[in-house]
């Protein structure tokens, strides 16, 4: 039994284009630190491309993964990132959640989480979908 959460930073390109890549890197660091503060030591957080992340949640049901995803979404939404030049930046994330069905590979579960993430983005971003 395991679940996967796929995360994408909403409008990350706009952050890089507006504030520069140094601020974009700062945003990534803040998001990673926040996520790490909310997951268990047995959970695995990995970067999956530019502004996408995956969390592997061993021994976690879909219901519990959805609760965690919502806590992460809210935690990021409530965060204010202070840049070195005094700007305050807020970001949101979209999350797709999937649970492994019997016989599915990790790759198949990641694909389901990616499809759920697409639905979250399609329905307005800053939300969790399964």
PLM region spans:
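Cell-envelope/extracellular polymer assembly enzymes that use nucleotide-activated donors
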Residues: 3, 94
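Catalytic-core segments of nucleotide cyclases and related cyclic-nucleotide turnover enzymes
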Residues: 62-70, 99-129
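Alpha-helical scaffold within the catalytic cores of cyclic-nucleotide enzymes
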Residues: 32-33, 64-81, 114
């Amino acid at each position: 039994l395991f679940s996967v959460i796929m995360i994408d930073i909403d409008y990350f390109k706009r952050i890089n284009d507006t504030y520069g890549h140094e601020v974009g890197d700062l945003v990534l660091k803040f998001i990673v630190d926040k996520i790490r503060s909310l997951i268990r030591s047995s959970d695995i957080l990995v970067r999956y491309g530019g502004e996408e992340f995956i969390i592997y949640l061993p021994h976690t049901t879909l219901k519990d993964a959805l609760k965690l995803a919502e806590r992460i979404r809210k935690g990021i939404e409530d965060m204010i990132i202070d840049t070195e030049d005094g700007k305050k930046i807020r970001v949101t994330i979209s999350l797709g959640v999937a649970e492994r069905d019997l016989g599915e590979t990790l790759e198949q579960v990641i694909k389901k989480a990616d499809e759920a993430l697409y639905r979250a983005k399609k329905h307005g971003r800053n939300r969790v979908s399964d």
